[in-house]
Amino acid sequence: MKSGRFIGVMSGTSLDGVDVVLATIDEHRVAQLASLSWPIPVSLKQAVLDICQGQQLTLSQFGQLDTQLGRLFADAVNALLKEQNLQARDIVAIGCHGQTVWHEPTGVAPHTLQIGDNNQIVARTGITVVGDFRRRDIALGGQGAPLVPAFHHALLAHPTERRMVLNIGGIANLSLLIPGQLVGGYDTGPGNMLMDAWIWRQAGKPYDKDAEWARAGKVILPLLQNMLSDPYFSQPAPKSTGREYFNYGWLERHLRHFPGVDPRDVQATLAELTAVTISEQVLLSGGCERLMVCGGGSRNLLLMARLAALLPGTEVTTTDAVGISGDDMEALAFAWLAWRTLAGLPGNLPSVTGASQETVLGAIFPANP
């Protein structure tokens, strides 16, 4: 069974940077050693946003974007190696999620697409890469997402305490770690995605720092109720979603009914949308004693306060409080999934994704010996 140093690479739906994590992994433990966040050039970020909102590309443009993202991921890995004074031979493998540009797990031909050419990463780092983690689960009738609940269960489950792990990235997803029950998990809906999209369009800021805009505004209840009527929120699990659905166009369609509203009030309403949709799903899933939050949204104190207010009797905390960096959780998970793939172990949970069976995930891109 392969064990040793692994690197995880994650570029999520929030597009706030490439997260790279170094960890020692074996069958008994996952120990994080180092991490960094690598910036995504504005031009690449905009290109990804355009695809996710349905903008058409030529095959040449798509191929160039795939290559550019692969090079970006390789640069991020090499920066971490240099920082830690490590060589390619010191690393067993890289687990690279890739950049999701489309996720459509239902319909006649379900599919999901993550780009960032793994061949570029191997060629530029000299390290074996495991990538393309989601499509095997979809081929077996699953959603292909979320995959991280398996990792949450391995690290954070408790024999008697009802726990849930909430990742608030661009999309928010919930892992249900309830003693005596199969692990559950699904996407609750937008996390930071709509909040970030709104302030980017209105003020040119990548996110609402310290929730300043949201705190300065007031929740527009009719707008909130209008958004909450979206059928996704009442859809039963298993379910997953992404930027191809909850994007700026989705927000614009709802705002058409509310002309002339204060931008700060919209920001406050979007924060409340995230808090309400998450808390409703926690309660519908039977509630928990402890909700452990990770991802960028865990640093949004307004969001954390609203979750605590909407979930009385639940301890709302961060995964950092139990020793796992909330910023690095997903990258760490894909390092762990790479280890499982090389060990020939399944990486999905059918109780989460709806797949017909457990399966080894991913494709292996071997480095030259």
Swiss-Prot record:
<dbReference type="GO" id="GO:0016301">
    <property type="term" value="F:kinase activity"/>
</dbReference>
<comment type="pathway">
    <text>Cell wall biogenesis; peptidoglycan recycling.</text>
</comment>
<keyword id="KW-0547">Nucleotide-binding</keyword>
<dbReference type="GO" id="GO:0009254">
    <property type="term" value="P:peptidoglycan turnover"/>
</dbReference>
<keyword id="KW-0418">Kinase</keyword>
<dbReference type="GO" id="GO:0006040">
    <property type="term" value="P:amino sugar metabolic process"/>
</dbReference>
<keyword id="KW-0067">ATP-binding</keyword>
<feature type="binding site">
    <location>
        <begin position="12"/>
        <end position="19"/>
    </location>
    <ligand>
        <name>ATP</name>
    </ligand>
</feature>
<dbReference type="GO" id="GO:0097175">
    <property type="term" value="P:1,6-anhydro-N-acetyl-beta-muramic acid catabolic process"/>
</dbReference>
<dbReference type="InterPro" id="IPR043129">
    <property type="entry name" value="ATPase_NBD"/>
</dbReference>
<comment type="similarity">
    <text>Belongs to the anhydro-N-acetylmuramic acid kinase family.</text>
</comment>
<dbReference type="InterPro" id="IPR005338">
    <property type="entry name" value="Anhydro_N_Ac-Mur_kinase"/>
</dbReference>
<keyword id="KW-0808">Transferase</keyword>
<keyword id="KW-0119">Carbohydrate metabolism</keyword>
<protein>
    <recommendedName>
        <fullName>Anhydro-N-acetylmuramic acid kinase</fullName>
        <ecNumber>2.7.1.170</ecNumber>
    </recommendedName>
</protein>
<comment type="function">
    <text>Catalyzes the specific phosphorylation of 1,6-anhydro-N-acetylmuramic acid (anhMurNAc) with the simultaneous cleavage of the 1,6-anhydro ring, generating MurNAc-6-P. Is required for the utilization of anhMurNAc either imported from the medium or derived from its own cell wall murein, and thus plays a role in cell wall recycling.</text>
</comment>
<dbReference type="GO" id="GO:0016773">
    <property type="term" value="F:phosphotransferase activity, alcohol group as acceptor"/>
</dbReference>
<comment type="pathway">
    <text>Amino-sugar metabolism; 1,6-anhydro-N-acetylmuramate degradation.</text>
</comment>
<dbReference type="Pfam" id="PF03702">
    <property type="entry name" value="AnmK"/>
</dbReference>
<dbReference type="GO" id="GO:0005524">
    <property type="term" value="F:ATP binding"/>
</dbReference>
